[in-house]
Amino acid sequence: MVQVEKGHVAVVFLNDPERRNPLSPEMALSLLQALDDLEADPGVRAVVLTGRGKAFSAGADLAFLERVTELGAEENYRHSLSLMRLFHRVYTYPKPTVAAVNGPAVAGGAGLALACDLVVMDEEARLGYTEVKIGFVAALVSVILVRAVGEKAAKDLLLTGRLVEAREAKALGLVNRIAPPGKALEEAKALAEEVAKNAPTSLRLTKELLLALPGMGLEDGFRLAALANAWVRETGDLKEGIRAFFEKRPPRF
């Protein structure tokens, strides 16, 4: 269900283009396995997520939707947990992640893009959290959406279920950069390469801080930051970075 191009920057393709790359249970499991494999590979410094074909991800699997109301509570909960694990895994992934939104990103597909650290969106693409339009609720997405855009903007997006174009998505803070038509993957890879040049330890620690700080008070946040500042000074990456600075050469992390 996914294809992986390995390298310094790995690219993970949602690979079900005929069905617009839905987040089926099989797709979620394939993505989780791919992310596990890439985390274990020390040669991979960053990961790009994108979709094959004309869509990033259309969200729910239509075949699954047709029978979802007939499933029992246990099976529905099991499916919800698989999506929860996927969103949590991407959102807390130790290596930098960049979503290349090459086409429509709808419902869970839009949530998957948002879970990445950075998002590059094709200027002709649209995204939205459309669950309420068919009686669903964007429950898992809401956890990270409200952190990304704030309560009022999250309510606007989730209660209307409207689709937004790239320019508005950037203004809201849903995406970081807008790419010319057909260039989302190219620009996402370039952005990932830029990030991947930096110290891996610093990148991982920065991500951990940004995850922890929103749930902390001011004093606790500063204390955690001070600990991180002290800890990083003992790492090999910092020693190499300082050495390279004084030797006037690029660091070799």
From Swiss-Prot:
Catalytic activity as recorded in UniProt: a (3S)-3-hydroxyacyl-CoA = a (2E)-enoyl-CoA + H2O
Annotated family: Belongs to the enoyl-CoA hydratase/isomerase family.
Protein name: Putative enoyl-CoA hydratase
InterPro entries (UniProt xref): ClpP/crotonase-like_dom_sf, Enoyl-CoA_hyd/isom_CS, Enoyl-CoA_hydra/iso, Enoyl-CoA_hydra_C, Enoyl-CoA_Hydratase/Isomerase
UniProt xrefs under PROSITE patterns: ENOYL_COA_HYDRATASE
Family matches, as CDD domains: crotonase-like
UniProt KW Lipid metabolism keyword: yes
GO biological process, one term: fatty acid metabolic process
Active site: 131
Keyword annotations: Fatty acid metabolism, Lipid metabolism, Lyase
Subunit structure: Homohexamer; dimer of trimers.
Superkingdom classification of source: Bacteria
Lipid metabolism keyword on record: yes
MF terms (GO), sorted A to Z: lyase activity
